[in-house]
């Protein structure tokens, strides 16, 4: 009896769960099929999906009382990391399901609708996604036109959504809409509704699929919504719907490092492996100083992303309300996605011509990681918001000097000493947006340095910590120099006249 109990307990440990999942990925991508060839086509064969989903990976985001593993952030990030080491689109597929459907349902859905939904995820390999973006309202989600009204005991929802990951593939959706007011206007607040594609009245029509540039595994498209859902499928906000949306999106952004972790590690492993084997004269590529610098950049990204995962595991669980944690959520999402793109670019660069193939992990990685810098808030917008929120805090605290303020701010206090000389200036008010973007990048990197130091305190190896801090100091010094440049160059709309070089040759 004791032996059986021990066996069951071992089977339930995270390490065993992840090992089984990784084995399923190897079988699906290297034995059943060839991941490099699969990456040339859209979607995945049913047999490959079945092998992967047989391990019930999405159980990590389902509460234990419904048969899941407990919605533990550490486990969710470990799953995302394991998936992204082999396939970034697969990891994003799981990220959409976890952060944009299962976690919101766990936290905000009525109890009577949870059990059947979670059961289908556990036993029928169901999937879910989130619909916010509309053709005319991308980042301007608060002005969305999708609307709802009461229809007896139900809600009637109409509108148009697009660029939702898993378009036509998800079984469930969280659809965002604004209530119709008696005067014909739409309410300012936003509500979320669960839809079930198995119910005819709740089916969302796919008008067309898009030919997305990368992430071939994930279908995107244009959706027309004209559905009727029961009242109990409306999510219940703790205060306002907008704050619920912020909580959901901030949690999602804080879990981006899980998708970045395995991806960056794969770029690092591929780059080191290639440079170790590629001979130039009597030495391999690792003998070149420029190559050492490039690979150390990827290694710094690996360390920073590890620290972000460590931090996210402690703060982004569904028990916490993250609606007011915009600085931290934006900093994590924007910086880690920039690091993902840079790591892929560097891996391709050292791989030479072989990397310039969609069937090569680095070439594919550039195209697949690029949209991460755009969706869920473009990075320029997020960096701008970080800077604006920080300037507001500095104004409220009556501390104009950036270094002095960061030395007292809880997210940067531990790392501020490393940058005190570089950041010994007052940003001032009325910065141009391009300067706000630079300031946001600076702040996000100081926050990341604090994460790295916190991870070091828990035993992470010192040489990786030292290298990552050095690269962060270099990046911040470069960004500060940009702040001092009085660049006000703007685009010239009518640039053609007098600019044809042939006329002067």
Regions found by a protein language model. Name each.
Residues 326-414, 481, 485, 491-493, ...:
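Alpha-helix capping/hinge segments and adjacent helical runs
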Residues 158-204:
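A short core secondary-structure module
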Residues 36-37, 303-335, 348-349, 454-457:
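C-terminal helix-coil-helix/basic helical segment that borders enzyme active sites and/or dimer interfaces
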Residues 1-96, 108-109, 113-123, 421-505:
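Amphipathic, small/basic residue-rich leader segments at the start of a protein or domain
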Residues 206, 210-301, 370-379, 388-456:
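Glycine-rich beta->alpha junctions and the first turn(s) of the following alpha-helix
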Residues 123-132:
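A short, Trp-centered hydrophobic/proline-enriched beta-strand micro-motif
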Residues 146-149:
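A structural signal for short hydrophobic beta-strand segments in well-ordered beta-sheet cores
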Residues 92-112, 138-141, 276:
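N-terminal glycine-rich flavin-associated loop
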